[in-house]
């Protein structure tokens, strides 16, 4: 619990309507998408950068833990207050789009802006912000930067880090820094903005983001390839991507995911398929679209594709992407709890990774539906637990073997979900002692009292 003097300070600073210690608010901010619960000591909603600075300065002086929070949509516990402390939420007030500069193709936003809302606003100006995580309708841009969120457009357009031009960040001691510039080129000084991206709130609190925008492509079209064997689908991915065609998206669902989506939504997916690939291309003329789809179909069929369907209208387009976006919730038919992680490997290693997952599934007796962003090698593996109390420990062992498989294939523990709490103990699998010490020293230099989001990322 917070001492009375701390409670009074925060109430005086932001007002009683923006600081809470009652159980209702603490319960509302004690969990994220992992469904784990850790009760904070208080919840505060700063109105501006100055208040963030004063909050952090005070907390640093009094050694009070601060957990920055966007929408709480993360899958790794990054926004959980595991040892009490103060949840600093940006969703209530810091949700404004400050500027959309159509001449320079940049935008300035506050960290609480919802990703999908931002996309909609820039599209009104025929502009395009590509990063589109599955949580786009809930997640904040500040959270996206803190996790380096990806999405389905990553195959062609990259991920959040590719669009962050500059940040304003409040450090643990309350000091405010600028990192990066509005310019396309900037090699003056260290890349501090790059350090803050994917730092999960451990190094500072983001108060403003400058993002790069693109001109919106006028045309797009999607298609689905059907494969009897998942290995064929994975081979088709890297061979297509290395052929000169660059699809906007290259997504997959395995057989278990297909069946789950069909059981829940009946979208007409081929339930007996080993896997499907859902792809999208864009361009400025119809001939460009047609050529890309023709090339993709050619490479798919050369690698075992037994059916190729091009979406002919908006409804078919929406149905394809609805199926992919709702795969995560659909697989709940296989168990009461899922261990959901997002390992990433080089694209050519996808067949080997999925083979290892199949072996681990058989070894432990778990259903492990997989889907994800194969265009950038990012696979969402989901270990389904029918009896969480009985199976949790065994499930963690199975997931550790999946992590080991990804690392052995020169991959990584996480492509976009981050490390947070759920993967913190596995960091030594991916990094040696010297590398982990470097991370800890960076953390200590910027947050010597360890008040910002402690225990995350294995730090």
Task: Identify the residue ranges that each predicted region occupies.
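N-terminal accessory segments
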Residues: 1-32, 61-64, 299-317, 408-409, ...
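FAD-binding subdomain of flavoenzyme oxidoreductases
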Residues: 96-251, 452
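Activity-critical C-terminal alpha-helical subdomain
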Residues: 175, 424-459
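N-terminal flexible segment immediately upstream of the FAD-binding catalytic core
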Residues: 1-57, 73-105, 134, 255-266, ...
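Glycine-rich tight-turn/loop motif centered on a GG-T
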Residues: 38-45, 87, 106, 336-344, ...
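Conserved, mostly hydrophobic/aromatic
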Residues: 59, 381, 447
